[in-house]
């Protein structure tokens, strides 16, 4: 697979909660088509990094770009509903009465989805329907 375009870029991102520094100088590049894992011990800032990228929280400093557009910086903040990002951290966040497609589509219900695109992505990820 050719990784030809940068989808997400985070540079020098920092986040603190009170006096507790959770992220310091966090950097990340995610290329189109790449499968990425973020590993670390409990409390190392993995969830915080993802929440910052999704827009659920604002970083204290640094820049986050999505498809070469600045979505979070000192001057810019694009709210989560405009970022076209969805996350499911653990299986307890899934609706047990919905299948894979319906669980994913639930978070996208406010956005226009091209016919067949969701099925295409599910197939690309080798998920069972």
Q: Across the structure, where does each feature detected by a protein language model lie?
A:
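Conserved structural motif at the start of ABC-family nucleotide-binding domains
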Residues: 8, 23-25
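Short beta-strand immediately N-terminal to the Walker A/P-loop
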Residues: 36-37, 87
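The feature captures the beta-strand-to-loop junction immediately N-terminal to the Walker
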Residues: 39-41
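Helix-to-loop junction immediately C-terminal to a conserved catalytic motif
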Residues: 54
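ATP-binding/catalytic-site motifs of ATP-hydrolyzing domains
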Residues: 63-65, 69
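Conserved ABC ATPase "signature" region
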Residues: 69-72, 113-129
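ABC ATPase NBD coupling module
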Residues: 70-86, 110
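Short coil-to-helix segment of the ABC ATPase nucleotide-binding domain corresponding to the Q-loop/switch region
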Residues: 98-105
């Amino acid at each position: 697979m050719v990784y030809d375009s940068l989808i997400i870029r985070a540079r020098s991102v920092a986040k603190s909660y009170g006096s507790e520094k959770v992220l310091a100088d966090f950097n990340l590049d995610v290329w189109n088509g790449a499968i990425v894992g973020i590993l670390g011990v409990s409390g190392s800032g993995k969830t915080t990094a993802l929440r910052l990228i999704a827009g659920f929280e604002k970083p204290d400093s640094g820049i986050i770009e999505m498809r070469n557009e600045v979505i979070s910086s000192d001057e810019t903040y694009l709210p989560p509903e405009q970022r076209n990002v969805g996350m499911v951290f653990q299986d307890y966040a899934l609706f047990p009465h919905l299948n894979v497609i319906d669980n994913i589509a639930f978070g996208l219900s406010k956005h226009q989805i091209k016919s067949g695109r969701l099925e295409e992505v599910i197939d690309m990820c080798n998920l069972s329907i």
